[in-house]
Amino acid sequence: MSMSDPIADFLTRIRNANMAHHDSVEAPASKMKKDIAEILKQEGFIRDVEYVEDNKQGIIRVFLKYGQDGERVISGLKRISKPGLRSYVKADAVPKVLNGLGIAIISTSNGVVTDKVARAKKVGGEVVAYIW
């Protein structure tokens, strides 16, 4: 059976592994998923990301991050733009997540970036997800 929303599946795998306090999670790789994982790493939401070649599309392995007492670094993940209802924003309407405590991942003409970068470059695009 084909998957209708691979990005939502990727975010759900991360959310579920995070709730179960798993050390890492694997998902089929794609360019968009790699870009999202790199942003999560840069912003400090995950510990590391690794790409495994399997002579097909590859596998992306995300290593989750927890605090000193085992508290989760990722409090929540939410898919915004879905295949049935795309969500686009103009450069002057880029959203803030929890008043700047979280990030919005936006797919722009300059690639996949955070809301802060999109605001700085004055570009809009498709709002992929919110992470806080």
Curated annotation (Swiss-Prot):
Alphabetical UniProt keywords: Ribonucleoprotein, Ribosomal protein, RNA-binding, rRNA-binding
Organism field: Limosilactobacillus fermentum (strain NBRC 3956 / LMG 18251) (Lactobacillus fermentum)
Subunit structure: Part of the 30S ribosomal subunit. Contacts proteins S5 and S12.
InterPro entries in the cross-refs: Ribosomal_uS8, Ribosomal_uS8_CS, Ribosomal_uS8_sf
A molecular function GO annotation: structural constituent of ribosome
Pfam family, one: Ribosomal_S8
Stated name of the protein: Small ribosomal subunit protein uS8
Protein task: One of the primary rRNA binding proteins, it binds directly to 16S rRNA central domain where it helps coordinate assembly of the platform of the 30S subunit.
Record-stated family: Belongs to the universal ribosomal protein uS8 family.
GO cellular component: ribonucleoprotein complex; ribosome
